[in-house]
Amino acid sequence: EEMDHCRASLNRVGWRVDYVVSHEAPAALAEGLCRERGREYRGDRLQRFLAELDDRLGYRAWFFGHYHGDEWRDDRHRLVYRDIVPIESAAPGSQF
């Protein structure tokens, strides 16, 4: 299963990466984005898995795009749709 493979890969690197790029967002962000857009939130297995990663993983910035917007949701989560975001300048000052 892909999620188990992901966990095993992250175990090998001590749960530390520079950046995360996914289509979907972790559950808490997904729920807020659905609410803001007047959509029903249906929390699914992938969103819960991404929430697990978000809680455990050390990273500089997380980029996702499912919700068709362009904004920083907080200091490490960037919704990307049309913007071009140079990764070198992403989340300046954030550390893992």
Regions found by a protein language model. Give the residues of each.
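Extended recognition/assembly regions associated with phosphoester-bond processing machinery
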Residues: 1-96
